[in-house]
Amino acid sequence: MKYRFQYIESVPSLPNAAMVRGSFVHRVLELLLARAAQDRTLDAVRKDFEIAEGEFRLRDDFRLLLLDATSEADFWESCRECVRAYYRIEQPATANIVELEKWVSTPLGEFELGGFIDRLERDDRGLVVSDYKTGAPKPLRFSTDYLRQLTYYALMCETQLNETPHSVRIYYLGGGKDEHTRDERVVTQAVTGATLADVRDTARRVFGEIEAGKSSGEFATNVTNLCNWCDFKQWCPAHGGDIAQALSAGTERVALRRREAGLPEKS
């Protein structure tokens, strides 16, 4: 159903602080790790933080948060704490980075699956597909969905790079100061033939369901706790909403926020 709201109905959505913080911290670490290993110093990351902050202050998603002075200060401090957490779990000079923000794709019958890998690294066993999460650490049993998403990228690497990553890995950077050990913050799962087959089959099934939904106009709903964070919940039929109102109401909601932020209306 979320696919329908985003790509069929084209209902615009609003950013939230967690989303923007995640994008910002990714950008800081992208700038840092793009440097030569010996140049990934504390002075460098401070400079990269300033560069990213300058970029984000001009971005619509940051401006649409409408942060007051106190909330803005809290936002930047939460970003700094995520970067500090990164340094508590990894010395950046030791990271063997293969690619950052690399586009990969793979054909699946008549469909194509593609996306950007945030961080592709190499250790003594081979490639690892990695990502950062700026939320609090979750144990392996509760990180399944995140790791599954990364396994799709491992599948794409197998096709495009002719090398299958041996693991997928999440670096959790949220959750406060010194409250979590490195083992809690770095969660790794092996990539196996079974996990690759599982995501391949799932992708084909989902693509088939999307095509069927496009033809019939009917998209299945999947009610979970994540619905509470969905920007389209108020219009979702599973929650008593009216899809017919979504585009006009969503467009007006975003237009109002843009006016409040002093941004020009989108054509």
Task: Give the ranges of each region predicted by the language model.
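Charged, glycine-rich intrinsically disordered N-terminal tails and low-complexity linkers that flank
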Residues: 1-31, 267
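Mg2+/Mn2+-dependent nuclease catalytic core
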Residues: 98, 102-199
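Hydrophobic (often cysteine-bearing) scaffold residues that line and stabilize catalytic clefts
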Residues: 17, 21, 25, 75, ...
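A non-catalytic, helix-rich entry segment at domain boundaries
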Residues: 28-100, 107
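Short, polar/flexible loop-turn hinges at active-site or ligand-entry regions and domain interfaces
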Residues: 9-18, 35-40, 139-142, 217-219
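Conserved phosphate/pyrophosphate-binding and hydrolysis machinery centered on Walker-type P-loop NTPases
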Residues: 14-22, 65-76, 220
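Glycine- and acidic
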Residues: 6-13, 64-65, 132-139
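Metal-dependent nuclease catalytic regions and adjoining charged, substrate-binding loops involved
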Residues: 157-267
